[in-house]
Amino acid sequence: MDPVVVLGLCLSCLLLLSLWKQSYGGGKLPPGPTPFPILGNILQIGIQDISKSFTKLSEVYGPVFTVYLGMKPTVVIHGYDAVKEALVDLGEEFSGRIVFPLTAKINKGYGIVFSNGKRWKETRRFSLMTLRDFGMGKRSIEDRVQEEARCLVEELRKTNGSPCNPTFILGAAPCNVICSVIFQNRFDYTDQDFLSLMGKLNENFKILNSPWVQMCNNFPILIDYLPGSHNKILRNNIYIRNYVLEKIKEHQETLDINNPRDFIDCFLIKMEQEKDNQQSEFTIENLMTTLSDVFGAGTETTSTTLRYGLLLLMKHPEVIAKVQEEIERVIGRHRSPCMQDRSRMPYTDATVHEIQRYINLIPNNVPRATTCNVKFRSYLIPKGTAVITSLTSMLYNDKEFPNPDRFDPGHFLDASGKFRKSDYFMPFSTGKRVCVGEVLARMELFLFLTAILQNFTPKPLVDPKDIDTTPLVSGLGRVPPLYQLSFIPA
């Protein structure tokens, strides 16, 4: 018999055995499309827009279904009711994080994003308490964001209305806020170390969103035996970790346990308090990875939202005009915006929310994992199963947001023009793994966008109707196309 035929039969048998085990050997997975050997359902899922493929599959198989990304099953949960049931009602059972081969090489199970169990719980609890103590959502961090907003405005003023690519400067502002929280101070936008750090973070985010990295995570053998952009991520990560380690050493030399200056100091003090605990999760390794996580998550997500937001606003100049009218009426031109202004600026608040809804930055959430065998609806999902919760299915729900494919701040306004909250608005996810930096990110988006539109009118280089807002090919997140604009003084 032809060796190729034998190999094909063997692989098919292995796949059938795997499917049988999941159906009868400890779990009853939801239905889904029949997978191919080795590849699973990858060929049936459009890489260009995975969330759209999941929506189509939900119409066939219902709100809970199974796909195979490679040879391992992934349960997809689609729609508000099912997502809420999983992430909120059964929050503990769905609070695990799936371990991707590439991130495992980078983080080694440490940090806050891709850790699990006791380490994740303790690191997350510490991070939330520390950020809260330093004023997340309170006055002190608002001061830092306002300071950075003023620096951002001055940097934009230096362009003198000439066309520019906003990618770097819109990344520098949120990155500097993170620096002020974990390193105590911000950097000048021309600082070479800062420029290098920004470059590595931006490059990593782009690579992580590439189809190649998705292939590497589904077929780990590619990581060790083939060249590719995944190696660039590993090299960039070494640079970022070394940079962070130098900052930690500087803090160790000047630490005053009675007067913590920033996040690093607080972590070092916690390490000292637990130095006799052999099982302590507060180690230098965990600190380095946690800081790298905070940098990556806290910089690129906010930066991309700002960049995408300005592109959408330029395509809808009537929205810019309404926001600027509200800014003029509530704030004026002689003081900086503050968070107290938000409650008196419903249209601006609605616009910020609509930007986040429309861009749908992380359409399929960061994949979770079950922490135990879970009975979910009529299925039994085995411990350790990958779970994808579709945020698209809520942010683009046509009953909650009529004409969801249209950018319209009215989605968040009631009939009287007051701001309208929506339970379907979950760009930061929900439940036990909700984004740690949600409060900070909301503050940055409101203050940065308001400060920009208070001082400038973004002007495209093409007719607004010709602006293309279609995202580039994306994996984890949706990235806007590159563009240039002019910041015309208002």
From Swiss-Prot:
Q: Print the keywords alphabetically.
A: Endoplasmic reticulum, Heme, Iron, Membrane, Metal-binding, Microsome, Monooxygenase, Oxidoreductase
Q: Where does heme bind?
A: 435
Q: Which domain of life is it from?
A: Eukaryota
Q: Where does the protein principally reside?
A: endoplasmic reticulum
A GO molecular-function annotation: iron ion binding
Gene Ontology terms describing biological process? organic acid metabolic process; xenobiotic metabolic process
EC number(s) for this protein?
A: 1.14.14.1
Name the coenzymes or cofactors required. heme
- Similarity section: Belongs to the cytochrome P450 family.
Protein known as: Cytochrome P450 2C1
